[in-house]
Amino acid sequence: MSMTEALLHKRLAETPEMEPCDGVKLLYQSRFGCGHLLPPDGQLVERIRAEADELPENAALPPFTFIGNGLCRMNLAAPAVRALPPERLARMMTLTAEDVPPMQPGDERLPGFEHDLSLLRAAALAGRTLFSAAALDGYLAEYRAAGYPPASHSPRYRTAYRPAYRVISGDFAVLLPLLSAIEDRIAQGKPALAVLDGPCGSGKTTLADRLSRLYGAPV
């Protein structure tokens, strides 16, 4: 079983109220990120702030839900995420969109997405979803004809899970404890110095680059 298939099965088990559009949205985001062009930074920050202000805190919700291909959903109701300033969350989104752009005509990622959709259909045939393979086929016929647009969550899914998240790089999830410590230092008006240690090939350079781009700081 591939990592994508295993992760898909895990998410289907965690959120069994998924309808075809919800499953497609999950797989779409794992390939194409947020799937649309982001507004200017100021608007992005205000949208995040406004949505977070309306959300009740949910301590049972994990800060991040991994969706595959190095991406995750950052859950805005999770306490650890709410503790970060909206400006930082917006910057995470912008950096992720730079690395994972929206789908384009003739996108080379489309065959991979189609493969993922075949895994979703196999899951439906195996009884892992509440919707049938026939229902998924009907949805996908219209979806493909429309040019593979970003999908929206179903009313059923929204009622069951109240999704409120942003799609970002999974590297930021790994960095969360460090980000929290850095933000504490910044809030106190103190300088922050981060030291990343680990064996060769463990990802230190990648994470250092993420930090540098996130804060505009030298490495």
Region locations from a protein language model:
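Hydrophobic positions on the alpha1 helix immediately C-terminal to the Walker A/P-loop
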Residues: 207
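N-terminal pre-Walker A segment at the start of P-loop NTPase domains
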Residues: 160-186
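Pre-Walker A (Motif I) flank of P-loop NTPase domains
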Residues: 189-194
